[in-house]
A protein has these predicted regions:
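Bacterial N-terminal signal peptides
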Residues: 9-17
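Short cysteine/histidine-rich zinc-coordinating motifs and their immediately flanking basic loops
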Residues: 105-111, 261-268
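Cys/His-rich metal-chelating microdomains
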Residues: 100, 256
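Flexible coil segments in periplasmic/lumen-exposed cytochrome c-class electron-transfer proteins
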Residues: 23-92, 134-141, 145-249, 284-319
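Extended intrinsically disordered, low-complexity coil regions enriched in Ser, Thr, Gly, Ala
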Residues: 112-141, 268-280, 284-293
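Short, cysteine/histidine-rich loop/knuckle motifs that typically chelate Zn2+
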Residues: 96, 252
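Bacterial N-terminal signal peptides that target proteins for export
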Residues: 1-10
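Sec/Tat signal peptide C-region and signal peptidase I cleavage site
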Residues: 18-22
Length: 319
């Protein structure tokens, strides 16, 4: 009886542990969700401007899902319709979320310089449902799924070729720090709390736009500071360069300096918050598809701290 009782106790502990793992919640800092009472500020009609641009746009215009605010059209090739205007009623302009030439932000992907085949595969995965997110009720995800379902093959090909043609550039500064501004969620990303104050960074990445008003205006030249825990970049470098018997180093697949390798995407200089979400989604089985098989063995044993470090390291590199 004592042996049976001990076995039952062990089984109960194992089940409790498995249940706790199954109920693990995705980190709120990585998957910001607007609070229930969140409201966008009203448009007072004042024209908005950004540096080095003669364009003037209102808040209503920069919030239009069927419009890509193009403050600096000389920075990139001509936008295809799918990127610049979309197609009503349900094909939103790619450049609305990802910005005019694709740098995106912490809330979504940086598309600059990704291979056209990779971009097309991701849209196919969103459309088929094999690529999901650990938090599905975020607008960046729901809009992407709806767009992928609505886009024709020709529209997908045109958008993919456009973003693939854009040369990647640095938009991220990774900063190791013990304290960060207190933050609130605004439109699916973090901003400094208007009330001010700081707090320990803990086990988080706190990525903020360097000019919040330009970010609201969807200026593709806006830059970001990704605050990460001290030691993250070096820890990430060591993790990225380590290879085991079953898992290659990161650059074995993603190329030297993590700049990409054919249809395998470059990771260098991309949003650490976004990269963390992808690692987390792979580990928890919600991001699947043809390219997932190679990633799953690489992430299955990573802790949250490991994923933060890898994302910080990749984000710190020159694209």
């Amino acid at each position: 009886m004592k042996r049976l009782s001990s076995l039952l106790s062990i089984a109960a502990l194992l089940l409790a542990g498995a249940s706790a793992f199954g109920q693990e919640k995705p980190p709120a800092w990585a998957y910001p969700v607007n609070p229930p009472d969140f409201k966008v500020p009203p448009d007072d009609g004042t024209p908005r401007k950004v540096p080095d641009s003669n364009v003037a746009l209102t808040l209503t215009q920069v919030r239009d899902l069927f419009f890509s605010p193009d403050w600096h059209p000389a920075d990139h090739p001509a936008q295809p319709d799918a990127v610049g205007r979309g197609r009503k009623p349900d094909l939103y302009a790619c450049g609305f979320c990802h910005r005019a030439d694709g740098p995106g932000g912490p809330e979504n992907a940086n598309l600059m310089g990704l291979s056209a085949n990779y971009i097309k595969q991701q849209l196919a995965d969103f459309k088929s449902g094999v690529r999901k997110s650990s938090v599905m009720n975020r607008a960046p995800m729901t809009l992407k799924v709806k767009l992928a379902a609505a886009a024709s093959d020709e529209e997908v090909s045109a958008a993919a070729a456009y973003f693939a043609s854009v040369k990647p550039r640095s938009v991220i500064h990774v900063k190791e720090t013990e304290s960060v501004p207190k933050t609130v969620v605004a439109a699916w990303y973090l901003v400094a709390d208007p009330g001010g104050g700081t707090e320990p960074i803990g086990e988080r990445i706190i990525e903020l736009g360097d000019d919040p008003e330009r970010f609201i205006s969807r200026d593709a030249r806006v830059t970001f500071t990704a605050n990460v825990p001290p030691g993250s970049v070096e820890k990430g470098r060591q993790l990225a360069s380590a290879a085991t018997g079953t898992t290659p180093s990161c650059d074995a697949c993603h190329g030297a300096g993590l700049k990409g390798n054919g249809d395998i995407p470059g990771l260098a200089g991309r949003s650490p918050t976004y990269l963390f979400r992808q690692l987390y989604d792979y580990k928890h089985g919600v991001r699947a598809g043809p390219m997932a098989a190679a990633m799953i063995p690489s992430v299955e044993k990573l802790s949250v701290a490991d994923m933060i470090a890898l994302a910080a390291y990749a984000g710190s590199l020159t694209p």
